[in-house]
From Swiss-Prot:
Tagged with keyword Electron transport: no
Pfam families in alphabetical order: FNIP
Keywords: Repeat
The organism of origin for this protein: Acanthamoeba polyphaga mimivirus (APMV)
Protein name (database record): Putative FNIP repeat-containing protein L162
FNIP repeat residues: 179-221, 222-263
InterPro entries attached to this UniProt entry: FNIP (IPR008615), STK_FNIP-Repeat (IPR051251)
């Protein structure tokens, strides 16, 4: 059937790359001509279970598949031609799989092997050298898995690490669960990214980390001294929740991004690298910072922090600031160049809200009680275009004329009747709240709904270890990630997590905010 549309086939295929998988199917099902384009349309939003798609006429066009011997025969004889992500679980014979599908393996980039007998993968005749990223689980000997093309290695559970990795060309290693061994074995000199996992709590030793390391993540439990252990040249450094050691003469001057854990409470005066541009502290930190962070652009402090961060003698370059309740003082000075301000407050009448700099366009208010908008000087908010609220609000936002994007947390309890800004364009709202109050929303407002959990059950299994504390603080961290994405700010993120971002709206508005697994893994 010829193309009856006033648009070239190639352009149609190109535009469909920006649709989610469900929308792709709906779109090409509208006419016979579009169905004929199926051979050029691929589905890669998520990892699909093989037995759930094998019966489909377009099963050849899935790029991410999950094979599980418990639900299909271990004698697999089908792999899609252009598959990029292959996940294999339990009694599937990977040797047979590769031998029978040798001509289809050239496109595989990500291989995930879980609880199977791997054999000598690197000795296979039809070993797919296109593989760049490898995931392994259980007590597997990684020597049998490493092949020359692999540069990223993700290790789950208790994989066998009693080996020398120095021969490989790995640039990234991530341990997820269970790793707590000495780092006496040799990491490859090519390694740039290392995540030691949340259970790692074994002392680092001098020269145990490769000299070319740029990104280091020490997990939840790590709490040993680090002096003389970190290589010069390190750029990004993240400590876990339990870390409380001294950092004097321990952090290289090359570090530009530093995140401290929730229990870190020690003084940092004179100990922070002068090149820092991104700095985060947890809830336990409450030590002076004035004059210590001249180049920091992104600063997050915890609920205990109450010291000034700038004054006339110590100007600040901070453009993104997250602060807690203790800074609610009449004489507290906020940086003049702020663009994003996230406030975690515990007062009905927060003084700090009357001192918002004119430079702020992105404002997040997290409050455990309520806020009375009637007491606000609206002239202070003419510059705000993005506003986020998570609490009960008295009054109306109608006179916040420049707010075009509004995010309401799942615990937001105010009626939307005569509440929303007059010029609102985008509204992010929990799905059930939307159903109850949609009659109060103008038809020209683009709705983005999300489920009350913000994340799916599968995602929460991976994400739960990154957020601690009460739901209020969960919300703060999640919304921070969204606004980092909005501001296009360069920031540290955990390897399996992307920012919360708005996704495409579908016909029933049930699309929302989500936290997808990165396709880069």
């Amino acid at each position: 059937m010829s193309n009856q549309l006033p648009i070239h086939d190639d352009l149609i295929v190109y535009m469909m790359q920006f649709l989610d998988d469900c929308s792709k199917r709906k779109f090409i099902s509208t006419c016979r001509f579009l169905l004929e384009l199926q051979s050029r349309i691929y589905y890669d939003d998520e990892v699909y279970v093989y037995n759930e798609v094998q019966h489909l006429s377009y099963s050849e066009f899935f790029k991410r598949l999950y094979y599980y011997a418990g639900i299909i025969s271990s004698n697999i004889n089908f792999i899609p031609q252009n598959i990029e992500y292959l996940q294999i679980y339990r009694d599937v014979s990977i040797e047979d799989l590769f031998e029978k599908n040798a001509e289809k393996l050239g496109s595989i980039k990500y291989l995930d092997i879980d609880e199977i007998d791997t054999g000598k993968i690197n000795k296979l005749k039809n070993n797919p050298n296109s593989i760049k990223t490898l995931f392994v689980s259980n007590e597997q000997n990684i020597l049998n898995l490493l092949i020359p093309s692999i540069n990223k290695l993700y290790i789950h559970y208790h994989s066998n690490l009693d080996l020398n990795l120095s021969f490989s060309k790995l640039t990234r290693i991530t341990f997820h669960i269970g790793f707590n061994k000495s780092t006496d074995f040799m990491f490859p000199e090519s390694l740039e990214y290392l995540d030691l996992g949340d259970k790692f709590n074994t002392p680092l030793t001098p020269n145990s980390l490769p000299k070319n390391l740029k990104h280091l993540y020490l997990g939840y439990k790590y709490n040993y001294p680090i002096e003389n252990c970190l290589p010069y040249g390190l750029k990004h450094l993240i400590f876990g929740h339990l870390f409380t050691q001294k950092i004097k003469n321990a952090i290289p001057e090359t570090v530009t991004h530093l995140c401290m854990g929730g229990r870190f409470y020690r003084k940092v005066k004179g100990y922070l690298p002068k090149n820092l541009i991104h700095l985060e502290f947890g809830w336990g930190f409450n030590k002076p910072l004035l004059g210590e962070i001249p180049n920091v652009e992104y600063l997050k402090t915890g609920s205990s922090f109450e010291y000034p961060i700038c004054d006339d003698s110590n100007p600040s370059k901070i453009t993104h600031l997250i602060v807690g309740s203790k800074i609610n003082k009449s004489d507290y000075v906020l940086p003049r160049n702020l663009k994003t301000l996230i406030l975690d407050l515990d007062y009905d009448d927060p003084t700090i809200l009357f001192k918002i700099p004119n430079s702020v366009t992105n404002l997040v208010i997290v409050n455990s009680t309520s806020i009375d908008l009637g007491s606000f000087d609206l002239n202070c908010y003419d510059h705000v275009t993005h506003l986020t609220l998570n609490t009960f609000v008295k009054g109306s936002l109608k006179y916040f004329h420049n707010v075009d994007t509004l995010i309401l947390d799942q615990y937001f309890s105010t009626s939307l009747h005569n509440f929303l800004p007059n010029n609102l364009k985008h509204l992010y709202i929990e799905n059930e709240i939307y159903k109850k109050q949609k009659q109060f929303i103008e038809t020209n407002v683009i709705i983005h709904t999300f489920k009350s959990s913000w994340f799916s059950e599968t995602e929460d299994k991976f994400l739960s270890k990154f957020w601690y504390g009460e739901s209020k603080y969960d919300f703060i961290d999640k919304i921070i990630e969204y606004h980092k994405k909005y501001d296009n700010n360069k920031f540290i993120q955990k390897p399996l997590v992307e920012s919360i971002i708005p996704i495409k709206q579908n016909s029933n508005h049930d699309c929302g905010l989500y936290c997808p697994f990165s396709k880069d893994y």
